[in-house]
Amino acid sequence: MNEPTIAQPVLFADLIDRPVIATFDQPHASSDGGAVLLKAADRHVGVVAALTATVPDARAPTRVTHGVGDLIAQRVFAIACGHPDGNDGDRLADDPIHKLLLGRDPIDGGRLASQPTISRFEHTAAPRMLLAMSHALADTVIARHRRRRRRGVRLITIDLDGTEDQTHGAQQLTFFNGFYDHWCYLPLVGTLTFDDEARQYLVAAILRPGNAAGTAGAVSLLKRLLPKLWRAFPGVRLRVRLDGGFATPEMFAHLEAAGVEYVVAMAGNAVLARHAEPTVAPLRAIVATTHDTATTYAEAAYQAGSWAAPRRTIIKAEVVWHPGRAPRDNPRFVITNLRQTPAWIYTHVYCARGDSENRLKELKHALAFGRTSCTRFWANQLRITLTAAAFVLWQELQLRADRTALRGAQVPRLRQALITIGVQVVRSVRRIVLHFPQAHPDAATWARLARALGAVPA
């Protein structure tokens, strides 16, 4: 077994009034001490077990050191803790907390899987397995919120958002995308909003080639999600909210055949501009007088050439004023089958989808959603799925934090306060004790969350 390399001690001779020596020599210690909260969260959600149940393992059991469940758990917890790279497996192989997360003895338990083992596992990914994992992820999230919302749900809003994942190597199906001006993948992310809650919950994440159409995979994803939601929440109204990249005849036909509400942005064109002109024209005169942006709302019956019939179109008529610039028309269009007023539909329904982009930011910047550096496309889809599972655990912690000082905090702040905590692990015959710093600034909040996840006073 390779011994870990210990950093050489360093000396700050004159940093303060006496020498300061720093050395990495504390055995049985970890910098991810708070990660036991993630394991406790998974006990309530069950996402690791759900994913594990979908993955076959054809290896001879007598020759297996790291089972599929251990590999999935190791990767999900590592990603959640801020260690998204497969190489992190080598650095964390003897970390006592990461051993504990897999149910191993934190002191004497076997080392965790190495980077080559993780890489081999990732490259076993195949379409059938990944589809089963996608179903398991969605089923787990939906079941969790069915238990949470025991009093029932009237409305579930489904947001689908495409995003770009810049690539830098020779991965399969990465292509140059002229819109983004670089080589990339184009993942598709699905979230759910229950009634008028402020938070969107991740329910699906699909990797798409870099040259995929904006709607690629969207209809098939809805075909999977809608029946699951109706089974879990009988009688619920389903509303699909999309940006302009999804406004295709196929999408509208599917939404209407499925009998769901929809609010879909539509890119402007000459015909829509003519519909908007009677509403925009008076605003120009207002802006010329007030020197301030003016906005109003209207509607029209618009029929694209590829549509069999006209659809209700909400018009946001706006003339934008900037000092030192000429006023600029800024009309926006939304296609919908809702019956409320144009202003209400645009401001209260469509604009609310903007917050779903914050979920993309959390995925990208806090959980390295774009760490798709495997050679094979399906291996990268597996990484996307495991990252989504890690985010599901974080969203469970966000729910529990809503009654604490960390209400509304995103993943980076929560990880700083709750997970990245130095800890010394002490094991006896009867128990394992985690010794955290007495001066940790969020100790009270940590303890409150631990109790919310099932811990009791010791």
Regions found by a protein language model. Name each.
Residues 1-213, 219-232, 258, 398, ...:
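Dynamic "connector" segments at or just before major functional cores
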Residues 4-23, 261-365, 452-458:
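An anionic, glycine-rich sequence signature occurring as long contiguous blocks
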Residues 28, 61-70, 325, 374-384:
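Structural motif
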Residues 41, 89, 346-382, 386-397:
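Short amphipathic alpha-helical "interface-anchor" segments enriched in bulky aromatics
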Residues 90-91, 105-107, 238-239, 401-411:
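Short, glycine/acidic-rich hinge or "gate" loops at secondary-structure transitions
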Residues 161, 236-247:
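Acidic/histidine-rich, metal-coordinating catalytic segments
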Residues 252-261:
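Short, surface-exposed basic-aromatic patches at helix termini and helix-loop junctions that form
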Residues 393-420:
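Conserved nucleotidyltransferase catalytic core and NTase-mimicking acidic/glycine-rich helix/loop elements
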